[in-house]
Amino acid sequence: SQLIMIVTLFSIWMSLAWALVILCSSVHFWMKRSDFNVDTSPLEHYPMVTVVVPAHNEDVVIAQTTKAILDLDYPHDRVEVLLFADNCSDDTYQEMLKVQAMPEYAGRNITITDRTGTGGKAGVLNDALKMAKGEYICVYDADAMPEKNALYFLVKKVLEDPERHVASFGRNKTRNSNQNFLTRCINQEIVVTQRVYHVGMWHLFKIGRIPGTNFLINTEFVKSIGGWKNGALTEDTEISFKIMQSGKLIALAYNSEAFQQEPETLKSYYMQRKRWAKGNYEVVLANFKHLFSGGNWRVKLEVFNYSCIFFWFNLAIVLSDLVFFANVAAMITQLFVPDVRIPFAFDAQNIYIVQLMLFNWLLMILLYLLQINIALASQFGQATTKQIWLALVSYLTYSQLFIVVSLDAVGSVILDKILKRKETKWVKTKRFAG
């Protein structure tokens, strides 16, 4: 039991130290960019860009998304739009046609495909890769609402170093953040991920990750690495590792922003996050060999980072919870049965280990609150007193769901391997109008 406690405590302290390093990196990044002057001066040249929108039963939101893309502040003659209604049973295809027929979009380069192929989102992207005429491919999900300069900033970033920056990615913001308690918590999570974690990793290690939406990638480069993996649950993570393995960079275009809808029901949220967790597990396991090979150091760091987050640190938190509650239960039982021993303690007659676990929890809560408050402070209009109280409540509720989702996803991955199951269909997140 002492070994379990030592390993658990060491693991938690390591995770806290790592999180603090990334947090400090992000703070340094934002301190250097604390002014509000945004440079949108004309580019030396505007490469042709193919914007791809994969959509599966998205008739509620696809019209808004299509209009937002067609209204982007980028030369219209340098934009090709490919819309895919993939195996839809609703009016997604018809909604796309309605937008295309609007007078204000007459003459625009729009191709609409009523697709019946396989492979999910990755399959759509591979079909688009064969059709694309642009030097770069930009991807937006069907619920995305890019701001007018989103594409401009993505292109500007890759043009800073076209040889190394084969891709760029922006930030995503929650469209429906005030809908309910769940969406408010998701909003805080996304703000921390985008404003702290992604920024910190890029600033310190020049490591970027392809998100599911609002990213740009060199067309010929994608072809050279074999495109997207059909059926991948997280095609974005999978191709990110391919890019890093090639020695190229996925550059952060922090001024490129797009709004996206988040799940508004617990069931929808759970299924989405389980799919993401499963996909990330599969990618990590597939790339684990690079830890011990002569591959790119960024790949090694990312594999180690993912392994720690999804396996080591997650297990440590579960063990710490078990140790804490087992000890508390034993202490309560001692009030009635004095001979009961505390199961996890360096000295069976003291409660130091319980106090240490409480101290660990306090450290984790403080760091959690610090991350959220710094992230919110870096985004206009987000840092409020309500957000602080929400962060505290979400730590005790929403953030604990990550453990449940992770354990469920691990079990599902193991069963997939045993039963040789393959999940290649779309997993639909319910959309809402507005």
Label for each model-derived stretch:
Residues 76, 85-94, 117-118:
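A conserved acidic beta->alpha catalytic loop
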Residues 47-50, 80, 223, 238:
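Cell-envelope/extracellular polymer assembly enzymes that use nucleotide-activated donors
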Residues 231, 240-259:
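Catalytic donor-sugar/metal-binding loop of nucleotide-sugar-dependent glycosyltransferases
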Residues 63, 90-99, 149:
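Acidic helix N-cap motif at the loop->helix transition within catalytic regions
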